[in-house]
Protein backbone atom coordinates (compact mmCIF):
# COMPACT_ATOMS: atom_id res chain seq x y z
CA UNK A 1 0.00 0.00 0.00
CA UNK A 2 0.98 3.61 -0.34
CA UNK A 3 0.60 6.87 1.53
CA UNK A 4 1.29 10.51 0.77
CA UNK A 5 3.68 12.67 2.73
CA UNK A 6 3.72 16.41 3.17
CA UNK A 7 6.81 18.03 1.56
CA UNK A 8 8.51 18.92 4.84
CA UNK A 9 8.36 15.42 6.30
CA UNK A 10 11.19 12.95 6.02
CA UNK A 11 10.92 9.23 5.58
CA UNK A 12 11.43 6.84 8.49
CA UNK A 13 14.95 5.75 9.38
CA UNK A 14 14.04 2.14 10.12
CA UNK A 15 15.16 -0.55 7.70
CA UNK A 16 13.63 -1.58 5.43
CA UNK A 17 12.03 1.81 4.88
CA UNK A 18 9.21 2.41 2.38
CA UNK A 19 10.48 2.90 -1.15
CA UNK A 20 9.95 6.59 -2.00
CA UNK A 21 8.14 7.73 -5.14
CA UNK A 22 8.30 11.52 -5.07
CA UNK A 23 6.12 12.47 -2.11
CA UNK A 24 4.79 8.91 -1.76
CA UNK A 25 6.10 5.78 -0.12
CA UNK A 26 5.03 2.16 -0.25
CA UNK A 27 5.16 -0.87 2.01
CA UNK A 28 3.36 -4.11 2.71
CA UNK A 29 0.61 -5.38 4.97
CA UNK A 30 -1.91 -8.19 5.39
CA UNK A 31 -5.59 -8.57 6.23
CA UNK A 32 -6.38 -10.31 9.54
CA UNK A 33 -10.15 -9.89 9.59
CA UNK A 34 -12.84 -10.18 6.90
CA UNK A 35 -14.09 -6.77 7.99
CA UNK A 36 -10.95 -5.14 6.62
CA UNK A 37 -8.39 -4.85 9.42
CA UNK A 38 -4.85 -4.66 8.03
CA UNK A 39 -1.59 -5.16 9.92
CA UNK A 40 1.60 -3.37 8.86
CA UNK A 41 4.69 -1.76 10.36
CA UNK A 42 4.37 1.51 12.19
CA UNK A 43 7.33 2.98 10.30
CA UNK A 44 5.62 2.27 6.98
CA UNK A 45 2.72 4.67 7.63
CA UNK A 46 4.49 7.07 10.00
CA UNK A 47 3.95 10.67 8.90
CA UNK A 48 1.45 9.76 6.18
CA UNK A 49 -1.36 12.21 5.43
CA UNK A 50 -3.33 9.72 3.33
CA UNK A 51 -3.07 5.94 3.34
CA UNK A 52 -4.26 3.66 0.55
CA UNK A 53 -4.33 -0.13 0.39
CA UNK A 54 -4.12 -2.00 -2.92
CA UNK A 55 -5.60 -5.50 -2.79
CA UNK A 56 -4.35 -8.51 -4.75
CA UNK A 57 -6.95 -7.89 -7.47
CA UNK A 58 -5.77 -4.30 -7.92
CA UNK A 59 -8.62 -2.66 -5.99
CA UNK A 60 -7.37 0.51 -4.30
CA UNK A 61 -9.08 1.54 -1.07
CA UNK A 62 -8.55 4.39 1.37
CA UNK A 63 -7.44 3.22 4.81
CA UNK A 64 -7.99 4.61 8.29
CA UNK A 65 -5.31 4.33 10.94
CA UNK A 66 -6.82 2.55 13.94
CA UNK A 67 -3.64 2.77 15.96
CA UNK A 68 0.12 2.49 15.85
CA UNK A 69 2.78 1.42 18.31
CA UNK A 70 6.27 2.71 17.57
CA UNK A 71 7.91 0.61 20.30
CA UNK A 72 6.91 -2.65 18.63
CA UNK A 73 6.83 -1.10 15.12
CA UNK A 74 3.29 -2.34 14.47
CA UNK A 75 0.22 -0.52 13.16
CA UNK A 76 -3.39 -1.46 12.48
CA UNK A 77 -5.39 -0.04 9.58
CA UNK A 78 -9.04 -0.40 8.56
CA UNK A 79 -10.39 -0.48 5.02
CA UNK A 80 -14.04 -0.57 3.98
CA UNK A 81 -14.56 -3.13 1.23
CA UNK A 82 -17.91 -3.86 -0.47
CA UNK A 83 -17.51 -7.58 0.25
CA UNK A 84 -16.02 -9.74 3.00
CA UNK A 85 -12.29 -10.05 2.50
CA UNK A 86 -10.19 -13.21 2.81
CA UNK A 87 -8.11 -12.98 5.96
CA UNK A 88 -4.92 -14.57 7.25
CA UNK A 89 -4.56 -16.38 10.56
CA UNK A 90 -1.72 -16.05 13.02
CA UNK A 91 0.21 -19.21 13.84
CA UNK A 92 2.32 -20.14 16.84
CA UNK A 93 5.73 -18.57 16.30
CA UNK A 94 7.11 -20.29 19.41
CA UNK A 95 7.08 -23.61 17.53
CA UNK A 96 9.47 -22.31 14.87
CA UNK A 97 12.99 -23.66 15.08
CA UNK A 98 16.26 -22.78 13.40
CA UNK A 99 16.01 -24.34 9.95
CA UNK A 100 12.20 -24.16 9.75
CA UNK A 101 11.14 -23.16 6.21
CA UNK A 102 9.32 -19.85 5.76
CA UNK A 103 7.80 -17.76 2.96
CA UNK A 104 7.85 -13.95 2.97
CA UNK A 105 5.29 -11.95 1.00
CA UNK A 106 5.54 -8.26 0.26
CA UNK A 107 5.90 -5.35 -2.10
CA UNK A 108 9.67 -4.88 -2.55
CA UNK A 109 10.66 -1.53 -4.06
CA UNK A 110 6.99 -0.96 -4.89
CA UNK A 111 7.17 -3.55 -7.68
CA UNK A 112 4.08 -5.45 -6.54
CA UNK A 113 3.23 -8.69 -4.82
CA UNK A 114 6.28 -10.93 -4.46
CA UNK A 115 7.07 -14.14 -2.57
CA UNK A 116 10.47 -15.34 -1.41
CA UNK A 117 11.47 -18.49 0.45
CA UNK A 118 14.02 -19.21 3.14
CA UNK A 119 14.50 -20.56 6.63
CA UNK A 120 14.59 -19.35 10.20
CA UNK A 121 18.27 -18.52 10.73
CA UNK A 122 17.98 -17.62 14.42
CA UNK A 123 15.44 -16.96 17.13
CA UNK A 124 15.41 -14.31 19.83
CA UNK A 125 17.72 -12.10 17.81
CA UNK A 126 18.38 -8.63 19.20
CA UNK A 127 19.18 -5.77 16.82
CA UNK A 128 19.08 -2.82 19.22
CA UNK A 129 15.86 -1.43 17.78
CA UNK A 130 13.89 -0.85 20.98
CA UNK A 131 12.37 -2.52 24.03
CA UNK A 132 11.02 -5.46 22.01
CA UNK A 133 14.35 -6.75 20.79
CA UNK A 134 13.34 -10.36 20.14
CA UNK A 135 13.19 -11.04 16.40
CA UNK A 136 13.06 -14.02 14.11
CA UNK A 137 16.10 -13.85 11.83
CA UNK A 138 15.43 -15.16 8.31
CA UNK A 139 17.40 -15.64 5.11
CA UNK A 140 14.37 -15.26 2.82
CA UNK A 141 15.20 -12.24 0.64
CA UNK A 142 13.38 -9.11 1.81
CA UNK A 143 14.08 -5.57 0.65
CA UNK A 144 12.81 -2.02 1.17
CA UNK A 145 9.05 -2.21 0.62
CA UNK A 146 8.69 -5.62 2.28
CA UNK A 147 8.12 -3.92 5.63
CA UNK A 148 4.83 -4.99 7.19
CA UNK A 149 4.40 -8.07 5.03
CA UNK A 150 3.57 -11.50 6.47
CA UNK A 151 6.03 -14.30 7.12
CA UNK A 152 4.38 -17.72 6.70
CA UNK A 153 5.09 -21.20 7.97
CA UNK A 154 4.45 -24.24 5.77
CA UNK A 155 0.81 -24.36 6.97
CA UNK A 156 0.10 -20.92 5.54
CA UNK A 157 -0.12 -19.30 8.97
CA UNK A 158 1.45 -15.94 9.76
CA UNK A 159 4.28 -16.52 12.20
CA UNK A 160 5.94 -13.13 11.80
CA UNK A 161 5.76 -9.60 10.41
CA UNK A 162 8.73 -8.68 8.21
CA UNK A 163 10.20 -5.50 9.57
CA UNK A 164 13.95 -4.98 9.06
CA UNK A 165 17.08 -6.00 7.20
CA UNK A 166 20.76 -5.87 8.03
CA UNK A 167 22.57 -4.47 5.03
CA UNK A 168 25.57 -2.17 4.57
CA UNK A 169 24.32 -1.38 1.05
CA UNK A 170 20.59 -1.04 1.76
CA UNK A 171 19.73 -4.13 -0.32
CA UNK A 172 19.16 -7.73 0.66
CA UNK A 173 22.18 -9.70 1.86
CA UNK A 174 20.27 -12.62 3.33
CA UNK A 175 19.77 -11.24 6.83
CA UNK A 176 16.22 -10.15 7.55
CA UNK A 177 14.18 -9.82 10.72
CA UNK A 178 10.53 -10.42 11.53
CA UNK A 179 8.45 -9.56 14.59
CA UNK A 180 7.25 -12.91 15.99
CA UNK A 181 3.51 -13.58 15.87
CA UNK A 182 3.51 -14.24 19.61
CA UNK A 183 4.18 -10.53 20.14
CA UNK A 184 2.29 -9.19 17.12
CA UNK A 185 -1.00 -10.81 18.16
CA UNK A 186 -0.98 -9.14 21.58
CA UNK A 187 -0.07 -5.72 20.18
CA UNK A 188 -2.67 -5.94 17.40
CA UNK A 189 -5.37 -6.98 19.90
CA UNK A 190 -4.63 -3.88 22.00
CA UNK A 191 -4.70 -1.64 18.93
CA UNK A 192 -8.00 -3.13 17.82
CA UNK A 193 -9.57 -2.66 21.26
CA UNK A 194 -8.14 0.72 22.28
CA UNK A 195 -6.21 2.16 19.35
CA UNK A 196 -3.07 2.19 21.48
CA UNK A 197 -0.95 0.00 23.72
CA UNK A 198 -1.03 0.68 27.46
CA UNK A 199 2.10 -0.50 29.23
CA UNK A 200 2.58 -0.91 32.94
CA UNK A 201 5.45 1.03 34.47
CA UNK A 202 6.66 1.80 37.96
CA UNK A 203 8.90 4.83 37.53
CA UNK A 204 11.86 3.99 39.75
CA UNK A 205 15.54 3.28 39.32
CA UNK A 206 16.94 0.63 41.64
CA UNK A 207 20.28 -0.94 42.44
CA UNK A 208 21.29 -4.08 44.26
CA UNK A 209 21.57 -3.65 48.02
CA UNK A 210 25.17 -4.33 48.97
CA UNK A 211 26.42 -5.55 52.34
CA UNK A 212 27.94 -2.12 53.00
CA UNK A 213 24.64 -0.37 52.19
CA UNK A 214 22.71 -2.76 54.40
CA UNK A 215 25.07 -2.14 57.32
CA UNK A 216 24.84 1.63 56.92
CA UNK A 217 21.04 1.42 56.91
CA UNK A 218 20.95 -0.93 59.87
CA UNK A 219 19.54 -3.82 57.86
CA UNK A 220 20.62 -7.32 58.82
CA UNK A 221 19.87 -8.94 55.46
CA UNK A 222 21.49 -7.59 52.28
CA UNK A 223 18.98 -9.37 50.04
CA UNK A 224 16.97 -6.66 48.33
CA UNK A 225 17.22 -3.51 46.24
CA UNK A 226 17.52 0.15 47.11
CA UNK A 227 15.58 2.85 45.28
CA UNK A 228 18.07 5.28 43.76
CA UNK A 229 15.57 7.48 41.92
CA UNK A 230 11.80 8.05 41.80
CA UNK A 231 10.48 9.69 38.65
CA UNK A 232 8.22 12.69 39.17
CA UNK A 233 4.58 11.94 38.37
CA UNK A 234 5.18 8.20 38.23
CA UNK A 235 2.99 5.50 39.80
CA UNK A 236 5.79 4.90 42.30
CA UNK A 237 5.74 8.56 43.36
CA UNK A 238 1.96 8.45 43.71
CA UNK A 239 2.31 5.39 45.95
CA UNK A 240 4.70 7.26 48.23
CA UNK A 241 7.96 5.56 47.28
CA UNK A 242 11.04 7.65 48.02
CA UNK A 243 14.71 7.62 47.16
CA UNK A 244 16.52 5.44 49.67
CA UNK A 245 13.63 3.05 50.22
CA UNK A 246 14.68 -0.59 50.38
CA UNK A 247 12.62 -3.19 48.55
CA UNK A 248 12.84 -6.59 50.19
CA UNK A 249 10.13 -8.52 48.36
Cite the ranges covered by each PLM segment:
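Conserved catalytic motifs of ABC-family nucleotide-binding domains
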Residues: 244
